[in-house]
């Protein structure tokens, strides 16, 4: 017979301290999610050019196009699925999609397997990474969104960078396949197990925050949320276009940089180092820039970060020296650290809790569509004019996106604080 003690459920509260065990667990899980993507940062473009003999840059970057398109669509549906099925179930579904990926990369007999593996990786990343972001925001409440996002992205992209470094080192000793990809097998198994057995759903936290919102809102359809996030709300539009261009230049760097460095004559160990420095700097600084956006506001960090990214890309295109490329990678990491958590926090600020998960999924759709657009555009430009021209063109586009953000975005953190005080 149940007793009162057995029926008693733990109290639901918002905040990082109040939810630190689950928050810490989600940070660890996102590190494994990031590690799955890090497997590819150094290896896959070189597998295409060296093992499969691909000579077209556009064809080599096709794996990023498949990844970006599928991840963008997965992001788009992730918010809907999270609201309907619960965050935990969608997280587990993401890991299920990712389990075959390292095996496909190790055993791929031709390039079509690599493209298919990256489509599955896109599903996995779109669902699993989205859920770790959304669940942390659910747990943190409105006062610490920037810190929550910063810690999430820190864990994910630190794992991307360290895995890129590790796989580059292993590849220089053992070759491109299969030994460096064993890391991905471990990541997939551990991440799935943690998600199944230890994660708790956070919909009760959303209900608590929604109940304390300053004003009740009529339910919005997905189409209405899509329109608001894409173009109707000026802050959400500014964030969406900046996110798209941010990942556009990241997609370009993912596909073009290893080929660019290799063409100049760098070895796998040095290419791995350059590919690792950028996400490592990005990840570490997000611990600082996330909370700074809670204090200083989102807009200034986003605009300055986009312009710093543009400068770093231009420096890469104009130089032919490892030291300058290393400096440019550091600058690119700093700029991205300023932009990435601030954009997600800005979207959260401008979204009502009742449709925030869907708004974040729409933002992440546009942002990760940038991978596909960046890889395709950079590949076409590189085939026509060379690697340096492709990098410089994306630098110019990144600068223009910062201008659009400066003109369009209003400071979202001011609005968020006003809402907190009103409540």
Give the ranges of each region predicted by the language model.
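Helix-to-loop junctions at the C-terminal end of transmembrane segments
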Residues: 74-86, 171, 285-297, 382
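Symmetry-related core transmembrane helices of the 12-TM Major Facilitator Superfamily/SLC fold
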Residues: 179-197, 391-406
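Helix-loop junctions on the cytosolic side of multi-pass membrane transporters
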Residues: 195-210, 406-418
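Helix-loop boundary and gating motifs at the non-cytosolic
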Residues: 17-68, 235-238, 242, 246-264
């Amino acid at each position: 017979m149940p007793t009162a003690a057995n029926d008693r459920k733990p109290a639901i509260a918002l905040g990082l301290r109040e939810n630190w065990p689950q928050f810490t667990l989600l940070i660890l899980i996102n590190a494994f999610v990031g590690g799955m993507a890090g497997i590819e940062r150094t290896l896959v473009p070189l597998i295409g050019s060296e093992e499969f003999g691909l000579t077209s840059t556009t064809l080599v970057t096709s794996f990023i196009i498949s990844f970006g398109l599928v991840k963008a669509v997965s992001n788009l549906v992730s918010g809907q699925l999270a609201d309907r099925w619960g965050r935990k179930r969608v997280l587990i579904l993401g890991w299920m999609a990712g389990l075959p990926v390292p095996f496909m990369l190790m055993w791929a007999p031709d390039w079509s397997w690599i493209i298919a593996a990256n489509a599955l990786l896109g599903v996995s990343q779109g669902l699993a990474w989205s859920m770790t972001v959304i669940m942390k925001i659910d747990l943190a409440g409105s006062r610490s969104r920037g810190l929550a996002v910063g810690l999430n992205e820190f864990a994910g992209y630190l794992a991307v960078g360290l895995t890129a470094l590790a796989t580059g080192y292993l590849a220089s000793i053992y070759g491109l396949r299969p030994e460096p990809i064993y890391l991905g097998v471990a990541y997939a198994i551990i991440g799935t197990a943690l998600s199944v057995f230890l994660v708790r759903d956070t919909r009760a936290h959303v209900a608590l925050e929604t109940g304390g919102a300053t004003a009740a809102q009529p339910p919005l359809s997905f189409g209405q949320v899509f329109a608001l996030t894409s173009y109707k709300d000026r802050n959400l539009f500014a964030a969406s276009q900046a996110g798209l261009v941010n990942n556009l230049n990241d997609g370009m760097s993912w596909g073009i940089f290893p080929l660019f460095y290799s063409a100049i004559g760098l070895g796998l160990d040095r290419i791995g180092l350059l590919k690792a420095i950028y996400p490592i700097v990005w990840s570490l600084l997000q611990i600082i820039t996330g909370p700074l956006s809670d204090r200083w506001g989102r807009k200034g960090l986003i605009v300055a970060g986009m312009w710093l990214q543009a400068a770093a890309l231009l420096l890469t295109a104009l130089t032919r020296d490892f030291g300058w490329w290393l400096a440019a990678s550091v600058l690119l990491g700093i700029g991205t650290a300023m932009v990435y958590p601030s954009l997600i926090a800005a979207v959260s600020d401008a979204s009502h809790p009742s449709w925030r998960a869907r708004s974040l999924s729409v933002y992440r759709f546009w942002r990760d569509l940038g991978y596909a657009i960046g890889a395709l555009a950079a590949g076409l430009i590189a085939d026509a004019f060379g690697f340096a021209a492709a990098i410089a063109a994306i630098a110019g586009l990144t600068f223009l996106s910062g201008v659009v953000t400066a003109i369009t975005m209003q400071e979202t953190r001011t609005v968020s604080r006003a809402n907190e005080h009103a409540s």
